[in-house]
Structures are given as structure tokens and as C-alpha cells.
């Protein structure tokens, strides 16, 4: 029997504050059906990299930068120069940085001691007993959580109808594994836990002898040890708060794990008392950055400055080449793509085919934040940035397709019933014997890459319920102005969303559009095309001073980023008659796809030619069908002619923006607070999965097992893994992603940018604490000003000391 020795009770308010504070340090994990890139440092953006490194190192032992050898190689190769090192050194905290360049170079030549996390109660008990308590806890919690959080994968649903803590207690009192392993009386201990997470946590931390000052650090370490389970609970809280509510799952899950420590300390307390007292005292002290952490952060900053120099040279080459600005002549074709870095390669290829082709970059949800129901489905897919709530409700099809809708629903039910029959406990054995040979053809086809999913072609989406004309006109006006597309319209304007068609890939949705919430972007593109082709909407736009020529047609498309093929939704056009001039557009798109595939093949392992790139999307054994957004390191908001024709190698998010058309700088504010933040999440997810793969990566794709439709395990057990697989950032020999924090370049008056930062403290924190770098471009498109933090700017060398740059303030 376990007896609890209570110390002085800890007030519930202190426990609540510490639990909530620790929970905010955990990034959310979206389920696999709509997985989006998440900044793993989301809770640390209020502190610089070295401070986050101190906190994470103490809790998990994770690094926040690359090994020193990675920087040494770049210094030796000359890509990181002495100037980069000196500039980074000058920006580091004076009390911990090396004295001069020589001292920094000397420090870079030495490898620091590995970061060791504080021991946990479970790890101390494992040392004392020889029993792998951390592994056993992860196994038992995972076994329960897989059923509790299941989103439809399991054949039998776990019990529901209570809090997460209550449901775990009901399960745990019948689980004899801990007692068999040596934790006698565990079931009784669980049965005596107070109802509610706060009372349970308060009792447990008293038993653990933790002071109020130690709680947040201890809770943070516990939540990190839960891996993706804690992150999924954080997602539930995120979604609840976005809807104006709250959710207690994360706090309950924390209580579940702390109850284990409470029981273990009671069982092994005498043997680990001294060690645990030292750990508890360490949790109560601040996590202070070490000199090595600051040195590593300086080296990281220097690597980023080297990349910024290269980018500045690329932009200067555009200027030196005399690249013309956008003229007044009418283009033959305009094509708006998502700002996704994969679009940059295709856009450059398309523009190279004809001087009359112009492309634009805009967030891939095209300004339409919609909750969409696909054909014959009642599931509302949130096709919008996860920072936002849907403002529209849409569906595919309409009353005229009710018979087809009914037939599709019946077919879907039959498929689900057949699938459950195949997987059921009893029938699965007979199924393999009786029906297994019927799958020989499918097995052969999949092995020969003959099958695979097709691009979805749902019926044309529509607003449900419809919006009044004034609302539709206002939406169309806002979107066109945000795209800086207000004049010189081409006869055909493509609105191209993007998605990826791959097979046998649990993380397939991560290759879709991040701005569309992890879904492909054709729905939003088709909706906007309908809106802009509406004659009544165009008349309303005319009254607002925005004239769209009568012969201009907006046509939606979908860019498959795996094959670089573009599907056009010409069937959505009003009237049903063939569109004049469409055939040359199809030819251009096919040629651009061929050029883009040839460029991408140079980076893809074993990609020999165009055909092999396409074949990868149907290969069920291919762990790298495409590189996704690996390599991303810049975000540029400027007119397209600043970057046109320059090889950015699929590393830059490109958002069209003309500040002189942005009266009041509302579009600038939208860009800085939405697309820039989404891009930062993507960039920092790739960064975290590269520098700290054990903490922020999902491991080896070859070992993945999908759990509950939520995430993956690496192997047959252990914690839920979040983040990117190793194959998404590494080619087997070298890193495919260079972990650099994003450099944001904006062509706008500095004061306008400063005003936006001043109004949005959370966004400003990203730049003040160097999770993002910020530059203002001058009137020639050069990187003339660097944001120095605290709403200050410093001149850079990019303008050779002679160019005054854009005005501090816009002319009135």
C-alpha cells in the first residue's frame, strides 16, 4: 500500500498559474488529416534563442542550434565571413559573449559539453531500481491515450463522457502493469486521487516537496516528456480558445503524468531523496543561459547573416541587370500563385516562356476563410490559416446534384463497412484467407506505380448560405487590393491553389497548403474565381473605382507540387462555352511544369528526369516524393519585378505588395500579422526538426505507425511523435534543409512597418527576439535597413552607404 506524506499544501492558484504557464510553452499538434506546420518554439517567442535554449536544455537536453562542426565547416569554406561573425558578436549579450573575433573563433573550434537535462523522478527511480520507469510510463500512457484521443481509426471507441483525468483513472485502476513491474498499490493510489486536475496536482506537488517557484519548470519538463500527446492536448486548447472557450485536457494530462511521479517517489523516496531534493531546488532557480549557448547563438546568427548577404546580392543582380518594372501594357496572362516557396520555381519557369506572362504571389487561401464541406460529406474542413476563424461556410455541389450526393454517401458507407469487416478481430483472419488473392492486382499496380490518388474534382463549390451582393463586392474588393491587382488585367487571370498527390504517406496533408489549414487550395481558388466572374460583383467593384475589363476571365487551377502539373477548372466558367485563348495557356503550363521538374530533379535523390519526378508521387515506397518547403529562408513582400528572373531556388516566400497602392497600410498590416506569421511557423518547424530532431521531429518514416488518426509512433510504442520526419530534412547523407531563421524583406516606409509592430506586440516579439529577421527595402529594392529591435532600424551595407532608401514616413 502506498502512503502519501504531505508537505504544506500549495495554493490552487499557484498550481493553476504554473500549469497554465507550462502549457503555453508547448506547441499544438494538428491531427494528420489537416496537419499544418507549427512553430515548436511558439511559447518561447518572448525570449531570445539562448534563453529558450537554457529552458529547453534543462527540461529535455535538446539543442537549439546545430553542432559546432556545422558552423566550422561554413567558416572554413568562407561562406561565413569574419564580417558576419563580428556583426553577430556585436549583437550578443555583452556579459556572456567572447571578448573579440579571435576569442569567438577559438570557441567555435571547440565542441561544448553535451547539454544534460535535469533528472525526473522516473529516471531517478529507474537508476535506483533498475526498472525502466520512463519507458513503462510512456508505454502505458501511450496505450491509453491512443484510444482516448482516437479520431476514428480504432474499431472500438474508448469510453467518453468525463474529463480526461477521470477517464484515465477509470482505466488505470484496472491496469496491473505498473504493479507487476514493481509499483505495488498503484491502482489503489490512483483510486484515491482527488477529483479534478487542480486538486490532484496540488496534492501531488506537496508530496513531491516542490516549492511554488519550482512548479512551472517541473511541469514544463513533464509535459515535454509526453511528446505529441501533450501537443495534441494543446491543440484542443488552441481550438477552444479560438472559438472563445477553453479546454482542460492539457491540465488533466499533466495531472495524469504527475500522479505517476507522486507514486514513484513514495515507493522509492528513501533511495532518491537526496538526489530529488537537489533537482527540486534546481527547478526553483531560473534557467540561465550558459556561455556556450550564447556562442552557439552567435554562430547561428552569423550563418543567417551570410545567407542574407547572398540574398542581397541576388536582389542587387536584378537591379544591375536593369530588370524593368511592371509596365502599363496589358499582359497576355496573369497567374496568381500561393506564396509557398515551391511556387517560386514554377512561377519563374512560367514567366521565362513569354514576356507577356506575369505572376503574382498571395496567401493560398486567397483571402477566403472558409469552412468547407466536400461533396457528400458533412465534415467542415477549415480551409484557412489556423490563426483565424472561418468567416464563410461553403459546400461542393447543390440541390441539382442531390441524387449523386445520396449515391456517394451510400458508396462511402459501404467502403467503411467493408474496411471494418477487413479489420475486425474475428473476420480479419477469414478475410485474408478468402479475399486476399483479390488484392493481387492492386498490389501489383501499386508496386509498379500504376495507381495513386487523382486530384480531387468535386463539383463547383458554392457559398452556403449565400452572401448578399454588398458582402460579395466588399470581399472581392479587399482581395484584389490585397493582391495589389487593381489595374492592367490580362484577358485570362489564373488563380492557382496548390496541393500534393502522394501515396502511403501519413504526413500527406503537411505537403498541402499551410494557408488552407493543411488542405489543398483549389476550393478557395474556385470560390474566388466565381466571385470575380460575377457580373453584379464587377459592377459593384466599378462603383468602388476598381475596373475589371469585360473580357477578363478569372480561372481557377490547382498546382500539384509533387509533379508540377496544373489542373484548370474550366468547367466552372459561366456560360459553358470554350474559353478563347485557353489552349496557349495550357501549353505554357505544361512547358513550365517540365522546366520546374528539371530544376527540382537536381535536388531530389534518385530523380533522373521529368518522368522519374512524376513517378515519385505514385511510389508507395518513396519516402521523399518532394522536398516540401525544405530550404525556406526568406519572405519577400514587394512588387514582383524586384525578384523576377532571379534564381531563388525555391527558398523564398514571395508576396506581391505595392505600398504606394496601400492607402492606410491596411494590406501591410495584414501581411505582417498573417502570412509572415504562417511563414514563420513553417520556417521554425523545419528549423526545430533539423536542430532538435529527437524533441521536435517525428523520427524515421520507415518506422512510423499511425495512431488514432492523430499522429505517428516511431516503432511499436513510446510517445507520440510530432514535427517533420527525418526524411523531410535530410537526404540520407546531408541535410536538405539549412536551419536558418526566416529573413523578412518588405518594401515599405520604415515608419509604416514600425507602426504595425507597435500595434501587435506578439508579432513584434518575433522580431525583437530574433526568431525572425526584418529588413526594409529601399526604392531600388535593396536591403537598406535592418530592424535592430525595440522599434529601431540600422542602415546596412547593402546600399553601399549611398542610397537613402524609402522615406521614413510615407508622403501625405
Swiss-Prot record:
Any Pfam family hit: DabA
InterPro entries per the UniProt record, alphabetical: DabA (IPR018752)
Membrane topology: Peripheral membrane protein
GO MF terms held by the record: zinc ion binding
Quaternary structure and interacting proteins, as annotated: Forms a complex with DabB.
PANTHER family: INORGANIC CARBON TRANSPORTER SUBUNIT DABA-RELATED (PTHR38344:SF1), UPF0753 PROTEIN AQ_863 (PTHR38344)
Protein name, as recorded: Probable inorganic carbon transporter subunit DabA
Species this chain originates from: Methylobacterium sp. (strain 4-46)
Encoding gene per record: dabA
Amino acid at each position: 500500500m502506498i502512503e502519501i506524506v504531505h508537505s504544506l499544501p500549495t495554493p490552487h492558484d499557484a498550481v493553476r498559474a504554473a500549469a497554465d504557464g507550462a502549457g503555453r510553452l508547448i506547441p499544438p499538434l494538428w491531427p494528420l488529416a489537416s496537419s499544418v506546420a507549427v512553430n515548436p518554439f511558439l511559447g518561447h517567442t518572448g525570449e531570445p534563442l539562448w534563453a529558450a535554449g537554457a529552458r529547453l536544455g534543462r527540461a529535455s537536453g535538446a539543442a537549439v542550434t546545430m553542432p559546432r562542426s556545422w558552423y566550422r565547416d561554413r567558416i572554413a569554406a568562407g561562406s561565413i565571413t569574419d564580417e558576419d561573425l563580428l556583426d553577430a558578436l556585436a549583437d550578443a549579450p555583452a556579459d556572456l559573449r567572447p571578448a573579440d573575433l579571435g576569442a569567438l573563433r577559438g570557441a567555435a573550434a571547440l565542441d561544448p559539453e553535451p547539454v544534460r537535462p535535469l533528472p525526473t523522478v522516473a529516471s531517478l527511480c529507474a537508476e535506483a531500481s533498475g526498472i525502466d520507469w520512463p519507458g513503462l510510463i510512456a508505454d502505458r500512457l501511450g496505450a491509453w491515450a491512443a484510444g482516448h484521443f482516437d479520431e476514428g481509426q480504432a474499431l472500438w471507441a474508448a469510453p467518453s463522457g468525463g474529463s480526461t483525468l477521470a477517464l484515465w483513472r477509470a482505466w488505470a485502476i484496472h491496469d496491473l502493469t505498473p504493479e507487476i513491474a514493481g509499483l505495488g498499490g498503484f491502482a489503489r493510489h490512483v483510486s484515491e486521487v482527488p477529483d479534478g486536475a487542480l486538486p490532484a496536482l496540488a496534492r501531488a506537488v506537496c508530496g513531491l516537496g516542490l516549492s511554488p517557484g519550482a512548479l512551472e519548470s517541473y511541469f514544463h519538463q513533464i509535459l515535454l516528456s509526453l511528446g505529441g500527446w501533450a501537443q495534441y492536448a494543446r491543440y484542443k486548447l488552441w481550438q477552444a480558445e479560438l472559438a472563445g472557450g477553453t479546454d482542460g485536457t492539457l491540465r488533466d494530462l499533466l495531472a495524469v503524468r504527475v500522479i505517476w511521479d507522486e507514486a514513484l517517489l513514495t515507493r522509492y523516496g528513501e533511495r532518491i531523496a537526496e538526489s530529488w531534493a537537489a533537482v527540486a531546488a534546481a527547478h526553483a532557480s531560473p534557467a540561465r543561459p550558459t556561455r556556450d549557448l550564447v556562442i552557439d547563438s552567435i554562430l547561428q546568427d552569423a550563418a543567417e547573416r551570410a545567407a542574407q548577404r547572398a540574398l542581397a546580392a541576388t536582389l542587387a543582380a536584378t537591379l544591375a541587370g536593369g530588370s524593368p518594372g511592371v509596365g502599363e501594357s496589358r499582359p497576355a496572362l496573369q497567374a496568381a500563385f500561393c506564396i509557398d516557396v515551391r511556387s517560386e520555381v514554377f512561377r519563374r519557369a512560367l514567366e521565362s516562356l513569354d514576356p507577356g506572362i506575369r505572376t503574382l504571389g498571395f496567401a493560398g487561401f486567397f483571402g477566403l476563410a472558409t469552412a468547407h464541406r466536400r461533396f457528400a460529406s458533412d465534415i467542415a474542413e477549415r480551409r484557412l490559416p489556423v490563426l483565424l476563424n472561418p468567416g464563410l461556410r461553403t459546400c461542393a455541389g447543390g440541390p441539382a446534384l442531390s441524387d449523386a450526393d445520396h449515391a456517394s454517401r451510400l458508396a462511402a458507407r459501404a467502403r467503411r463497412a467493408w474496411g471494418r469487416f477487413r479489420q475486425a478481430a474475428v473476420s480479419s483472419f477469414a478475410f485474408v484467407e478468402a479475399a486476399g488473392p483479390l488484392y493481387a492486382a492492386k498490389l501489383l499496380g501499386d508496386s509498379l506505380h500504376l495507381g495513386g490518388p487523382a486530384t480531387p474534382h468535386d463539383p463547383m463549390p458554392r457559398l452556403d448560405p449565400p452572401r448578399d451582393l454588398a458582402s460579395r463586392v466588399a470581399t472581392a474588393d479587399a482581395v484584389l487590393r490585397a493582391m495589389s491587382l487593381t489595374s492592367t488585367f490580362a484577358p485570362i487571370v489564373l488563380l492557382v491553389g496548390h496541393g500534393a498527390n502522394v501515396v502511403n504517406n501519413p504526413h500527406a496533408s503537411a505537403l498541402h497548403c499551410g494557408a488552407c489549414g493543411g488542405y489543398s487550395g483549389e476550393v478557395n481558388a474556385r470560390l474566388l474565381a466565381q466571385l470575380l466572374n460575377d457580373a453584379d460583383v464587377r459592377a459593384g467593384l466599378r462603383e468602388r473605382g476598381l475596373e475589371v475589363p469585360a473580357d477578363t476571365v478569372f480561372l481557377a487551377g490547382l498546382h500539384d507540387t509533387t509533379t508540377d502539373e496544373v489542373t484548370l477548372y474550366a468547367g466552372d466558367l459561366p456560360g459553358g462555352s470554350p474559353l478563347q485563348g485557353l489552349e496557349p495557356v495550357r501549353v505554357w503550363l505544361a512547358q513550365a511544369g517540365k522546366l520546374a521538374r528539371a530544376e527540382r530533379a537536381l535536388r531530389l535523390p534518385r530523380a533522373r528526369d521529368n518522368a522519374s519526378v512524376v513517378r515519385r508521387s505514385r511510389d508507395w515506397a518513396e519516402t521523399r516524393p518532394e522536398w516540401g518547403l525544405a530550404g525556406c529562408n526568406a519572405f519577400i513582400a514587394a512588387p514582383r519585378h524586384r525578384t523576377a528572373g532571379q534564381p531563388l531556388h525555391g527558398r523564398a516566400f514571395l508576396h506581391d505588395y505595392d505600398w504606394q497602392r496601400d492607402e492606410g497600410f491596411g494590406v501591410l498590416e495584414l501581411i505582417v500579422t498573417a502570412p509572415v506569421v504562417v511563414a514563420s511557423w513553417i520556417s521554425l518547424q523545419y528549423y526545430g526538426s533539423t536542430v532538435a530532431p529527437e524533441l521536435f521531429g517525428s523520427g524515421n518514416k520507415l518506422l512510423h505507425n499511425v495512431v488514432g488518426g492523430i499522429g505517428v509512433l516511431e516503432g511499436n510504442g513510446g510517445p507520440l511523435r510530432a514535427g517533420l520526419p527525418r526524411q523531410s530534412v535530410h537526404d540520407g547523407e546531408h541535410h536538405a534543409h539549412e536551419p536558418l531563421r526566416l529573413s523578412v524583406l518588405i518594401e515599405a516606409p520604415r515608419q509604416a512597418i514600425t507602426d504595425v509592430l507597435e500595434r501587435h506586440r506578439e508579432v513584434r516579439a518575433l522580431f525583437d527576439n530574433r526568431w525572425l529577421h526584418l529588413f526594409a527595402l529601399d526604392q531600388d529594392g535593396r536591403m537598406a535597413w535592418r530592424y535592430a529591435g525595440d522599434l529601431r532600424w540600422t542602415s546596412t551595407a547593402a546600399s553601399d552607404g549611398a542610397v537613402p532608401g524609402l522615406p521614413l514616413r510615407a508622403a501625405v
